[in-house]
Amino acid sequence: MSDFNFGEVTREKSKLRMALCGVSGAGKTLSALYIAYGITGDWKKVALIDTEHGRGKFYADRQDLEIPTGKYMYCELEPPYSPDRYISAVKSAVSVVGEDGVVIVDSFSHAWNNEGGVLDIKSEIAKTRPGKNDYTAWDEAGKYQNNLVNTILAVNAHTIVTMRAKMAYAMELNDKGKTVPVKIGLAPVQRDDTEYEFDIAMNIGRDHIAVTSKDTTFLDGFASVITPELGKELKDWLDKGVNPERCSDCGKVIRPTDTRTVAQIVEGSQKCYGRKLCINCVSKIVRQQKQEAKANENKG
């Protein structure tokens, strides 16, 4: 008997999981807002988590722009930029905009290399934990990073993160034929593999042109300035398919295991607990029941 459970695949409706990377001035925030508005058609269904010292407010209700903006939901995330505070902010934003809304994390880079971020956590572990150093501390610090990324990818709303790009300069000819230094973006300021966690990753240049670097949708080869039209096209694509089964307790999509299909997990949890539950939440309930039973035995 096989240890793996194969079944015919059915495409499910999905949520946007996008990363926008670019140098300072590339237009990451405005691009994220335009995509979010294109998806929702309602600025109050867009929540911006701002770590950029209030700069996220600059784009609100801008009628002077070629494509005007409205009044979106907003929260400034102040230091420390710990993964736990990011997670709390994201979950709060989801509760505000709902499952058809968009949560923008601007910027995700602060969770990595700013005050209270993962690099700070790694250094603190190396300094204070016996037997730990800058190398061995990564095992524990990486769990904070993974938990944050997994939360952003699992919440029941669309999510967009922006990331700063490490900057360098190259000499290029300008329109007058003179050689001048030009700022270029390199890798995102985040863990090396972060952009691969998202379904879509785009690099935005100083000319505001966004180029797809990773894509699982229809955007391979995309190279253009981002407008709300892109959000509309993405929504149409994401809405194709059936609604995935979600856990009634944690809200995450219920995934199959090596031995059980989603249908079997849903049927079993409804029979035993009266609601749809993922395997993790079922395990929590079972552990809690065992602890309560043991406590009752000790009382007896």
Model-assigned labels for residue ranges:
Residues 1-6:
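N-terminal pre-Walker A segment at the start of P-loop NTPase domains
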Residues 7-97, 102:
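Walker A/P-loop NTP-binding active-site region of P-loop NTPases
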Residues 23-25, 146-233:
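Phosphate-binding/switch region of NTP-binding enzymes
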Residues 55-59, 111-119, 168-174, 209-213:
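Switch/connector loops and helix/strand junctions flanking conserved nucleotide-binding motifs
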Residues 105-139:
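Conserved P-loop NTPase nucleotide-binding/switch module
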Residues 221-244, 251, 291, 295-300:
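NTP-binding/hydrolysis catalytic cores, primarily Walker-type P-loop NTPases
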Residues 243-271:
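Short recognition patches in nucleic-acid-associated and regulatory proteins
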Residues 264-286:
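Cysteine-rich micro-motifs
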